[in-house]
Amino acid sequence: YKRQGQLYRPVRERDVDMLKQYAIDMLESTGQEEISLSSLSSSDYSRLEELVTFLMDTCRERMVNISLPSLRIDAFSLDIMSKVQDVKKSSLTFAPEAGSQRLRDVINKGLTEEVILKGAAMAFEGGWTRVKLYFMLGLPTETEEDIRGIAELSNKIAALFFETVPREKRTGQVQIVASTSFFIPKPFTPFQWAKMSTKEEFLEKAHLTKTAIREQLNQKRIKYNWHEADVSVLEGVFARGDRKIASVILKAYEKGCLYDSW
């Protein structure tokens, strides 16, 4: 359902030697303390193990974190996770996208709750205590039950930590960071003609999610963030607007919009 998967077919991969050189150049020129592997699905990169092993050797002496965002839980490798944790643990990011199995099937996410929980258990067993979960609000056919499912799934993952990791082996308190963005219909995708929620509806959905999280047994272990509704509405206009939008953007610039987030 995401635009990238529709527009950029077929799948193409960067040369692993090129990525290694990029990593070295960026670490030497920026002094950053974390390097991230960013793609639509990092865990599907065919040379991931080789690349991570190289980064381990490169980053260990500099005490640089390695971050693996955009992981598909069903493709996640315990071996890769074990290698990354040898430097410094930051957080792991998973993207269930929806709180219920029904809605995940609607958007063709292809993840079951069993697979999600198994992936989280692997993370906890690997020594991680901080897991980020990405969801989307306002998806086509969404119901209140789907929204509450976000809180329930987050709670199950938090509870899984205590079930998976013995007390004597816990290196810290578990924290689940549940983040929601708002669905924005994009051209050239299966949902390009789907209805987009209003700002008020976005806020209502976010507040419902927050309330549902507060009702969970492990709510103190769950932190909730959501995307700005105002910015999401603007993104919707830009996504489906035509060339007439150019004059609007120019006018906004002339009125002082220079470094605004949108």
What are these regions (language model features)?
Residues 2-17:
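Canonical Radical SAM [4Fe-4S] cluster-binding loop centered on the CxxxCxxC motif
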Residues 216-262:
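Radical SAM enzyme core and accessory elements
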Residues 24-175:
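Conserved SAM/AdoMet-binding glycine-rich loop
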Residues 174-184:
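Core structural elements
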Residues 84, 91, 196-210, 245-257:
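Acidic, Ser/Thr-rich peripheral helices and adjacent loops at domain boundaries
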Residues 162-169, 210-225:
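Flexible helix-coil linker/hinge segments at domain or subdomain boundaries
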Residues 145, 182-186, 199-201, 212:
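Contiguous mid-protein beta-loop-alpha structural module that forms a pocket-lining wall or clamp
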